[in-house]
C-alpha cells in the first residue's frame, strides 16, 4: 500500500483550528481543543499501560466524550473498538483490552497534558469493528489506517465536501457506518453532530434548527422522518444504507425535495463500496451507484466481489477479492443493483436478523409444529420479520408474539405471524423461503 499521511487530526487542528469538530448535548469542541483533549486521553492511556498497537475499547454512549476518546486512543497508537450502546457485557474484545470510560475522559479533560504527533503506517490496524453477523455471529474485522483514509477520500470525491459541512451521526458508533462519520469528519476538517441514538423528534428538530448538511440513515429511519414531516430537503445529502429501501420511499423523499443517495457497503470494506452521486439521485432510483474512486466491484455468478485499498487485508480471498455473499448485478454503465443476499439474512430497520434464531425461539412454544421466518418487503422496516407457522393444535398468534418477545431482541420479534397448512420445501426437505414472501 502506498505511504499516506495518517496524522489527520494534527492536520485539521493546524489548518482549521477554530472550526467546530464535534457538537452534541449542548457542547461544541473546535479542532484545536479536540487535539489538546485527545492528547490528554493519550497520556491517560499511557498511564494505564496502553500505547502503540495495544487494544483499547471505548465504553461510553455516543456523544462528544466518545469521539474525544476515539481520537485520543488513535493518537496513542492504539487499535480502537467502540462498545455498543448497551455497554461492554458479552461483547467480543481482544485479549488485554484497556477500557476507556467516563472517569478516564473526565480525568483527561482536567489534566490537559501535551502529547506528540503520531502518524501510523497505513498498513497497520487502526480499528477493530465487529461485523454485522451476516453469516452467523459477528466477527472482528481489523481495519487499517489506510482503509479508513482511502474510504474517506473515495467518499469525498463522490459526494463532495464543503467547508461548512456538518454531518449528523445518529448511527451506533460500534458499527462501521457510525464510526466512519467521526473519522471522515476529522480527515476533512469538518464538523460532526453526534446524537446518542436515533430519536425521530430530536433529528426532526436538528434538521429544522441546526446547520446539518449530511445525514446518514438506515431505511427505517428515513421512513420515520418522512412520516414525521421532517425537513428532509434541508441537508444537501441524505445517505441511505444498511439494507433494502423501497422505490416508493425513495420517490417520496425525492418528491419532498430531498437529495437521497443510496449506498452499498459492508464492514470488511470500511463502509461504502458503491454510492450514487448527488446528481444521480433522481435518475438512478434503486441503484447503489458506481464503485467509489480507488475501489473495484464486479459480479461473479451473481455474487458481488470487491477489492481495493478500503478492504480489510484479512477479508481478501486467495484470488485477491472480497467475496461479500451479497447478490447483485452491474448494468451497462457500471451501476450496482443489489438484489439480496446469498444467505437468508433479514435486514429489518438496519438490524440484521437471523431467521434460524427466531425459528428456534418460536419452536419452543408448544402449539408450534413447524415454522419458517423470512423478510417481507415493508415500507417502514425495509424488510419486516414474518413468521409462517404450521400450528400443532389451537394457536393464538398474539400469544406467540408475546412468547417471542420474552426470548428475542426487539428487532428479532416477528412483525406478523401467518398460519399456514404446510411449508414449501425442496425434494431434500429444505424450506423454500423465497416462496413464502
Spans of features found by a protein language model:
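Conserved pre-ATP/AMP-binding loop-to-beta segment of ANL
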Residues: 2-5, 17-18, 113-130, 137, ...
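Conserved ATP/PPi-binding loop(s) of AMP-dependent carboxylate-activating enzymes
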Residues: 274, 287-294, 298-323, 329, ...
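Conserved AMP-binding/adenylation subdomain of ANL enzymes
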Residues: 149-166, 174-214
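Conserved AMP-binding A3 loop
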Residues: 30-32, 126-153
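Conserved AMP-binding/adenylate-forming core of the ANL superfamily
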Residues: 1-6, 10, 18-49, 57, ...
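AMP-binding/adenylate-forming catalytic core of the ANL superfamily
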Residues: 308, 327-412, 422, 431, ...
Amino acid at each position: 500500500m502506498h505511504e499516506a499521511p495518517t496524522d489527520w487530526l494534527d492536520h485539521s487542528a493546524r489548518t482549521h483550528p477554530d472550526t467546530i469538530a464535534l457538537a452534541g448535548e449542548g457542547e461544541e469542541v473546535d479542532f484545536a481543543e479536540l487535539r489538546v483533549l485527545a492528547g490528554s486521553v493519550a497520556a491517560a492511556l499511557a498511564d494505564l499501560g496502553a500505547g502503540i498497537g495495544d487494544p483499547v475499547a471505548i465504553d461510553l454512549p455516543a456523544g462528544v466524550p466518545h469521539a474525544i476518546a476515539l481520537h485520543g486512543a488513535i493518537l496513542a497508537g492504539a487499535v480502537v473498538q467502540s462498545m455498543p450502546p448497551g455497554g461492554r457485557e458479552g461483547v467480543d474484545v481482544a485479549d488485554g483490552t484497556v477500557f476507556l470510560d467516563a472517569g478516564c475522559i473526565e480525568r483527561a479533560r482536567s489534566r490537559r497534558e501535551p502529547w506528540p504527533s503520531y502518524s501510523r503506517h497505513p498498513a497497520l490496524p487502526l480499528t477493530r469493528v465487529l461485523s454485522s453477523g451476516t453469516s452467523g455471529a459477528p466477527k472482528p474485522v481489523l481495519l487499517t489506517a489506510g482503509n479508513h483514509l482511502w474510504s474517506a477520500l473515495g467518499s469525498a470525491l463522490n459526494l463532495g465536501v464543503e467547508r461548512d459541512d456538518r454531518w449528523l451521526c445518529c448511527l451506533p458508533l460500534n458499527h462501521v457506518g457510525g464510526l466512519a462519520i467521526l473519522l471522515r469528519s476529522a480527515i476533512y476538517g469538518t464538523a460532526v453532530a453526534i446524537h446518542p441514538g436515533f430519536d425521530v423528534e430530536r433529528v426532526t428538530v436538528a434538521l429544522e434548527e441546526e446547520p446539518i448538511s449530511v445525514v446518514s440513515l438506515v431505511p427505517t429511519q428515513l421512513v420515520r422522518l418522512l412520516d414525521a414531516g421532517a425537513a428532509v430537503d434541508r441537508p444537501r445529502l441524505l445517505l441511505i444504507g444498511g439494507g433494502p429501501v423501497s422505490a416508493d420511499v425513495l420517490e417520496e423523499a425525492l418528491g419532498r425535495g430531498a437529495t437521497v443517495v443510496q449506498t452499498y457497503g459492508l464492514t470488511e470494506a470500511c463502509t461504502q463500496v458503491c454510492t450514487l452521486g448527488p446528481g444521480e439521485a433522481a435518475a438512478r432510483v434503486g441503484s447503489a451507484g458506481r464503485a467509489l474512486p480507488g475501489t473495484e466491484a464486479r459480479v461473479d455468478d451473481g455474487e458481488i466481489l470487491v477489492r481495493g485499498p478500503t478492504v480489510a487485508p484479512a477479508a481478501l480471498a486467495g484470488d485477491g477479492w472480497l467475496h461479500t455473499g451479497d447478490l447483485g448485478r452491474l448494468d451497462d454503465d457500471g451501476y450496482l443493483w443489489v438484489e439480496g443476499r446469498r444467505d437468508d439474512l433479514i435486514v429489518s430497520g438496519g438490524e440484521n436478523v437471523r431467521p434460524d434464531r427466531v425459528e428456534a425461539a418460536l419452536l419452543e412454544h408448544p402449539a408450534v409444529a413447524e415454522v419458517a421466518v423470512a423478510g417481507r418487503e415493508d415500507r417502514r422496516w425495509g424488510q419486516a420479520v414474518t413468521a409462517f407457522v404450521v400450528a400443532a393444535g389451537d394457536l393464538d398468534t398474539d400469544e406467540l408474539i408475546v412468547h417471542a418477545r420474552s426470548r428475542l431482541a426487539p428487532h428479532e420479534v416477528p412483525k406478523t405471524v401467518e398460519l399456514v397448512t404446510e411449508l414449501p420445501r425442496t425434494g431434500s426437505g429444505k424450506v423454500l423461503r423465497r416462496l413464502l414472501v
